[in-house]
Design a protein with these regions (language model features):
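Hydrophobic/aromatic residues located in beta-strands of well-ordered beta-sheets
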Residues: 22, 48-49, 123, 201
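Hydrophobic helical membrane-anchoring modules
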Residues: 1-20, 31, 154-157, 179-236
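Active-site beta-to-alpha loop of glycosyltransferases that engages the nucleotide-sugar donor
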Residues: 24-35, 58
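Short aromatic/hydrophobic "clamp" motif used to bind/position activated sugar donors
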Residues: 95
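The conserved acidic donor/metal-binding loop of glycosyltransferases
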Residues: 99-104
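Acceptor/aglycone-binding surface of glycosyltransferases and processive sugar-polymer synthases
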Residues: 71-89, 106-184, 210-231, 235
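A conserved acidic beta->alpha catalytic loop
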Residues: 53-60
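Short, acidic, metal-binding catalytic loop of nucleotide-sugar glycosyltransferases
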Residues: 38-47
Length: 236
């Protein structure tokens, strides 16, 4: 039988997995999606898995056959609207985001969720950048490091990884937070705005592995949107 969290506020809680939604945004991830979902189900058997999908391959079909809740993405398309839809589709207390390319450690899902449920954090950010991950190209590492440094100066807060795809959000934080879902680099705003507004944010270090499949990221577009979201989160 899966461990119970114990007590929180004097009340016995459900098994931790029943309080977690794992949210992923997918685009042509048929090579990885089966492995990632299987790994999640073994790590947190009772977790809900929600996928917002804009694929032209068999990603959605494979995910549904394995028990994931799949939401097909229609206009407005793009990473921001997909992430917003995935976060808001959860009916559970904690939403853990994950990229569906096998780069992130599913064994951290439960510990990160516990840091929200037990320790009172509103957001737990999994930073890949304690050092340069072997799986991350140098240009990506330097860009991420530079943007994190800029955000740290702007917010007077030690930011490590603006673009991490693995975070645990308290669902009530998502419900209260005001942000612009449109455009790229939404994770930047979803980290910086809670910091600015005084929510309890915890940053931990996680490992990062080589991805399965091809990346769909556009570096120049991502850089522009990162700068735009740093500015928006600080001043708007």
């Amino acid at each position: 039988m899966q461990d119970l969290i114990g007590t929180f506020g004097g009340t016995l809680l459900e098994p931790v997995g029943r309080q977690i939604t794992v949210a992923m945004m997918t685009r042509n991830e048929e090579r990885a999606v089966g492995k990632v979902i299987g790994d999640i189900q073994r790590a947190v058997p009772d977790a809900e898995i929600v996928i917002v999908d804009s694929s032209s391959d068999r990603t959605a079909e494979i995910a549904q056959s394995l028990g994931a809740k799949v939401i097909k993405q229609f206009p407005p398309r793009g990473y921001g609207p997909a992430m917003d839809k995935a976060l808001r589709s959860s009916g559970r207390e904690v939403v853990v985001t994950l990229d569906c390319d096998d780069t992130y450690p599913v064994e951290f899902i439960e510990p990160m969720a516990r840091m929200v449920l037990e320790d009172g954090n509103d957001l737990v950010d999994g930073s890949r950048l304690a050092g340069k991950p072997a799986a991350m190209p140098w240009i990506n590492f330097l860009a991420n490091w530079g943007f994190a440094g800029l955000a740290s100066l702007a917010f007077f807060y030690r930011v490590r990884d603006l673009h991490s795809g693995m975070r645990a959000y308290r669902k009530s934080l998502i419900d209260r937070l005001s942000y612009d879902m449109n455009g790229a680099a939404l994770p930047v705003e979803l980290l910086l705005r809670p910091i600015r507004e005084g929510y309890k944010v915890k940053i931990i270090t996680i490992p990062y592995r080589p991805r399965i499949g091809e990346s769909t990221m556009r570096p120049l577009q991502s850089a522009w949107w990162t700068l735009k979201r740093i500015y928006r989160s600080r001043f708007v």
